[in-house]
């Protein structure tokens, strides 16, 4: 097995089991313990895990970022479908839109497959695949594929996005904090979303109820950039008042 494939397999094991041991990995991959230690050191440099005596543990801040797209898509699945249906009216009069690679936004895109006259700019490899036979005109951002999140990232991605302007950008995030704004755990993905936000007239944030009052590693956007927050249930009186005071349309 090539080193890059072994490291990818180790990442998946850490994501699934939350911790691994050097001796166990050495036996599984039939390489020396020193080779495994070097692999774990590389993953620690990425911020994916923390090495411990005899092994390593998953960094919890990286958990949702590195679990595979399809595994994340199954979490809060009914809530995501509900949010997608509630978001549909905000796309009705739009002809151009940008979409991130989140599983929540993917549910909205599935509902738009028969929509003619709509152009979609996205860095989601899953969206490009699912919408290949749809009525939507799909514009890919290009870039380097993150095989876990199924998103396209990097310098090229941002350069392509800057060529366009869209009526609305739809995205999700890992957390919402009244003081910090919309937060994410993946810095590379956050940079793509920030670029999309700058190229959009309006921004809609699609989040399930678990994301409110939840911290994450990277600030994605402050609330001055958000026009709509669409969720599955009331986030509480404080959030309702906050959105009203900040001219954000809150839908649940």
Curated annotation (Swiss-Prot):
InterPro entries: Carb_Metab_HTH_regulators, DeoR-like_C, DeoR_HTH, NagB/RpiA_transferase-like, Tscrpt_reg_HTH_DeoR_CS, WH-like_DNA-bd_sf, WH_DNA-bd_sf
Annotated HTH deoR-type domain residues: 3-58
Highest taxon in the source lineage: Bacteria
Residues within the DNA-binding region(s): 20-39
GO molecular function, one term: cis-regulatory region sequence-specific DNA binding
Keyword Cell division: no
GO biological process: regulation of DNA-templated transcription
Gene3D superfamilies: 3.40.50.1360, Winged helix-like DNA-binding domain superfamily/Winged helix DNA-binding domain (1.10.10.10)
Annotated keywords: DNA-binding, Transcription, Transcription regulation
SUPFAM superfamilies xrefs: NagB/RpiA/CoA transferase-like, Winged helix' DNA-binding domain
PROSITE patterns: HTH_DEOR_1, HTH_DEOR_2
Protein name (record): Uncharacterized HTH-type transcriptional regulator YdjF
Organism whose genome encodes this protein: Escherichia coli (strain K12)
